[in-house]
Curated annotation (Swiss-Prot):
Keyword tags: Bacterial flagellum biogenesis, Chaperone, Cytoplasm, Translation regulation
Name of the protein in its database record: Flagellar assembly factor FliW
Subunit structure: Interacts with translational regulator CsrA and flagellin(s).
Top-level division of the source organism's lineage: Bacteria
Gene Ontology CC annotations of this record: cytoplasm
PANTHER family in UniProt: FLAGELLAR ASSEMBLY FACTOR FLIW
Task of the protein: Acts as an anti-CsrA protein, binds CsrA and prevents it from repressing translation of its target genes, one of which is flagellin. Binds to flagellin and participates in the assembly of the flagellum.
Chief localisation class: cytoplasm
Location relative to the cell: Cytoplasm
GO annotation, biological process: bacterial-type flagellum assembly; regulation of translation
Protein source organism: Lysinibacillus sphaericus (strain C3-41)
InterPro entries in the record: Flagellar_assembly_factor_FliW, Flagellar_assmbl_FliW_dom_sf
Entries under Gene3D superfamilies matching the protein: BH3618-like (2.30.290.10)
Length: 147
């Protein structure tokens, strides 16, 4: 099926690519169907786009590429909601606040978006140790691994 996106125009997606966020995203609790679209193969960035609303789309970054010591635990409750069975099925992204220049942009390390790629489920979680990682972390030149 074709969907209109906020940043990439019209794209073709398959039903099996749709991610379900049972509780939506923070502030968008009613928005539950998203798709993850690549932006540039050379950058650890993607577009998390609502399937239903063109105006709801977020640039997301692979946070470990920008902060190599970024780490957190996923609670048992979140693991159950996401139906996580194997660690290799899990991907984490951070929502990007885009500014005029890439260097002025920030990523939200406080509330990562966790995806279970195998089960096509997602959830944005708020880290309990909220002093460890900021809401607006500067997007420095890549310091970690993008893989």
């Amino acid at each position: 099926m074709k969907i209109a996106t906020k940043f990439l125009g019209e794209v073709e997606i398959a039903n099996q690519d749709i991610l379900t966020f049972e509780h939506g995203l923070l502030g968008l609790e009613e928005e539950r169907k998203f798709v993850l679209l690549p932006i540039d193969a050379d950058l650890p960035l993607a577009l998390l786009q609502s399937v239903q609303h063109v105006e709801i789309g977020f640039v997301v970054a692979y946070p470990f590429a920008f902060k190599k010591d970024y780490s957190f635990d996923i609670s048992e409750e979140d693991r159950e909601q996401l139906q996580i069975e194997k660690q290799e099925d899990v991907l984490a992204y951070a929502i990007v606040t885009m500014k005029e220049t890439f260097q002025d942009s920030t990523i939200n390390l406080l509330a990562p978006v966790i995806l279970n790629i195998a089960k096509k489920r997602g959830k944005q979680i708020v880290l309990q140790d909220n002093k460890a990682f900021p809401l607006r972390y500067p997007m420095q030149p890549l310091e970690g691994s993008a893989k």
